[in-house]
């Protein structure tokens, strides 16, 4: 709350600001503690790991994305590793990390320290990288659509006054805010590709796909299919009214995947988004310079290359 309040009256690069915030939120939620003085180094380690996934050179050579990614992972292993025995000895924490440390398999064995660290690396990366991209996309569209920004501000204020936190029961009241968020994710999917492997032979689009073939779902393509999304390039949150959603194919909107492997963090993402947007819109207007159009990096996770320059204007001005 205080961090967001500090944006008022400033011109900010939104992406790095929100990334630091979501990393801190993820640390508090999943570790039970803030990162403290190591926050910047932890953040950079996650950035390096994600960028390594699309590095052209697939060996960890010096000065390559893969090399930086491997170093980033090694840092996180050293960071999380010593905490495992500490949490096991303590035995009382209710955060996700503590529960991983105490968890037992059906045969009574525990996860190894290496397995726990790998789980935490993935969980922390998933819990802040994609939501950073998603909220940044939403902020970009809020700044472009002042009419919708006013609608969502009114909805947020009706749920809770400025300066007050949303109660859990208030989250469901932000229906138009959720519609706007979903349309932002349709326009800029936080995960441009969802890799899978064919479990059986099948045919699709006139092609025969053998079992074992590496395949991929492209949300970015699916979200622009005119047969499901009339005038797909137009930004329109009313596409997500309950009637519209019921009338549409259930897999026409897949920023979080779908089926049995749908993103487990879906509702955590919605909750974070609503809390962040409530604190922003009840205190300030999001504005951009006339003609401003940032260039976006598409892979591995979309983000504005310049960080997204926003003017955060206090509502009393």
Where do the protein language model's features map onto the residues?
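Structural preference for long, well-ordered alpha-helical segments in enzyme cores
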Residues: 22, 80, 119-120, 135-138, ...
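Proline-centered turn/helix-capping motifs that create local helix->coil transitions or kinks
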Residues: 34-35, 54, 83-95, 147, ...
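Cytochrome P450 catalytic-core helices
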Residues: 130-155, 267-283
